[in-house]
């Protein structure tokens, strides 16, 4: 029997054969192209075919590093401030403007999942009766880590700043340490590019402790943390012998992390879109193929199966 089998269908009980260079074979090739290529074009042109970014939720592992830099403004003049930090080189530069505060900190794991959920921070700055605080600038340094996809480790900061024309007795802040991304994280591997100190605590130069320079260098990072408290509370009415107090609660919330998907995740996402469109084309062109071969639009050789005789009929035929 000449040719090769081009098409068969259980409902037709017939196989159709023709040569490889016949019109029927070329028609079958065209139908195959029209079945599989257009779904790919439709999925691609509908946008979102290739997954360029993805997201997941994770609570970061955050710990306070017990490193800070504190500046209290006491007047309008350029040298009217008191300062202290955990960096000895910075403290040596302050001379008579150095004032050592009393600190108390406590990190709390509220849901007992092994990760800290918030930091309670309190700073008490002793003041002379003639000294008044009209502004506060505070940098707190944290260790910030993500583990679910890639392992991302960095040193980050919370920056708290407030000024008032009225001298205060206490500044109260309560907010979240929010992750800020300008770049997607990797889907796997170890990323420690920002695991460096926010403040160069060993430098003897005053410019390295200038808050403007510290903030500018920190903002150059593609991944940072920002302390979000749009409504800090400034309290007034400090007693003559009472310290100025900074009282802050910094929460470590669950974050939505944006990352660059890996190869297999991208393929899986594209495959789902392609197959969902392909099923429609398979159904349509399957009916077209059945019509073409059943109605002999192109010349083929139908081959019908030879059904076996029934055992009863076979027995009767052999009876004498």
Curated annotation (Swiss-Prot):
Keywords in UniProt for this one? Cell membrane, Cell projection, Cilium, Cilium biogenesis/degradation, Glycoprotein, Membrane, Transmembrane, Transmembrane helix
Coiled coil, from the record: none
Q: Name one Pfam family in it.
A: TM231
Residues carrying a glycan: 195, 200, 222
What topology does it adopt in the membrane?
Multi-pass membrane protein
Q: What GO CC terms are in its UniProt record? A: ciliary membrane; ciliary transition zone; MKS complex
Superkingdom of origin organism: Eukaryota
Localization recorded for this chain is: Cell projection, Cilium membrane
One GO process term, biological-process aspect: vasculature development
- Which residue ranges traverse the bilayer? 23-43, 266-286
Q: What does this protein do?
A: Transmembrane component of the tectonic-like complex, a complex localized at the transition zone of primary cilia and acting as a barrier that prevents diffusion of transmembrane proteins between the cilia and plasma membranes. Required for ciliogenesis and sonic hedgehog/SHH signaling.
Outline the subunit composition: Part of the tectonic-like complex (also named B9 complex).
PANTHER family hit by this protein? CHST5 PROTEIN (PTHR14605), TRANSMEMBRANE PROTEIN 231 (PTHR14605:SF1)
* Family classification: Belongs to the TMEM231 family.
Report what the protein is called: Transmembrane protein 231
Q: Which organism is it from?
A: Gallus gallus (Chicken)
């Amino acid at each position: 029997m000449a040719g090769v089998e081009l098409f068969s269908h259980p409902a037709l009980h017939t196989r159709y054969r023709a040569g490889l260079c016949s019109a029927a074979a070329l028609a079958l090739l065209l139908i195959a192209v029209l079945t599989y290529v257009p779904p790919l074009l439709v999925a691609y042109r509908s946008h979102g075919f290739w997954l360029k970014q993805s997201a997941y939720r994770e609570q970061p592992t955050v710990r306070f590093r017990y490193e800070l830099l504190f500046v209290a403004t006491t007047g309008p003049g350029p040298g009217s401030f008191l300062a202290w930090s955990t960096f000895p080189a910075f403290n040596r530069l302050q001379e008579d403007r150095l004032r050592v505060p009393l600190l108390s900190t406590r990190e709390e794991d509220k849901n007992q999942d092994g990760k800290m959920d918030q930091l309670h921070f309190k700073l008490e700055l002793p003041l002379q009766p003639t000294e008044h605080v009209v502004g506060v600038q505070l940098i707190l340094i944290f260790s910030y880590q993500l583990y679910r996809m890639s392992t991302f480790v960095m040193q980050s900061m919370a920056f708290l700043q407030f000024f008032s024309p009225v001298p205060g007795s206490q500044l109260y802040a309560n907010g979240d340490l929010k992750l800020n991304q300008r770049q997607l994280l990797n889907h796997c591997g170890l990323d420690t590019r920002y695991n460096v100190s926010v403040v160069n605590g060993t430098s003897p130069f005053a410019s390295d402790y200038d808050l403007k320079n510290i903030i500018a260098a920190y903002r150059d990072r593609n991944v940072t943390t920002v302390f979000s408290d749009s409504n800090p509370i400034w309290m007034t009415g400090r007693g003559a012998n009472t310290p100025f107090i900074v009282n802050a609660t910094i929460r470590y919330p669950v974050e939505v992390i944006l990352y660059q998907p890996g190869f297999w995740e991208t393929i899986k996402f594209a495959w789902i879109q392609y197959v969902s469109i392909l099923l429609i084309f398979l159904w349509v062109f399957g009916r077209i193929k059945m019509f073409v071969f059943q109605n002999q639009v192109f010349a083929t050789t139908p081959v019908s199966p030879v059904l076996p005789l029934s055992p009863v009929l076979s027995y009767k035929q052999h009876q004498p």
